[in-house]
Amino acid sequence: SEAVAEKEDDPNFFKMVEGFFDKGAAIVENKLVEDLKTRGSPEVEGNLTFT
């Protein structure tokens, strides 16, 4: 049962998931920013703040 507990907390798995999440979030973020630029009216765009 100790071997099972070690596999559940495998830091390599968490690093791998975190890496995939970061890459996916960067792709989605760029797409969302582009969509906001093309769809927003000038009034709305003036109120948006990107950090």
UniProtKB/Swiss-Prot annotation:
Keyword Transferase: no
Residues engaged in binding substrate: K31
Reaction equations catalysed: L-glutamate + NAD(+) + H2O = 2-oxoglutarate + NH4(+) + NADH + H(+); L-glutamate + NADP(+) + H2O = 2-oxoglutarate + NH4(+) + NADPH + H(+)
Record bears the keyword NADP: yes
GO molecular function: glutamate dehydrogenase (NAD+) activity; glutamate dehydrogenase (NADP+) activity; glutamate dehydrogenase [NAD(P)+] activity
Entry EC number(s): 1.4.1.3
Biological processes annotated in GO: glutamine metabolic process; tricarboxylic acid metabolic process
Alphabetized UniProt keyword annotations: Mitochondrion, NADP, Oxidoreductase
Cellular component terms per the entry's GO annotation: mitochondrial matrix
Subcellular location: Mitochondrion matrix
Source organism, top-level taxon: Eukaryota
Similarity remark: Belongs to the Glu/Leu/Phe/Val dehydrogenases family.
Subunit organization: Homohexamer.
Function: Mitochondrial glutamate dehydrogenase that converts L-glutamate into alpha-ketoglutarate. Plays a key role in glutamine anaplerosis by producing alpha-ketoglutarate, an important intermediate in the tricarboxylic acid cycle.
Name of the protein this chain belongs to: Glutamate dehydrogenase
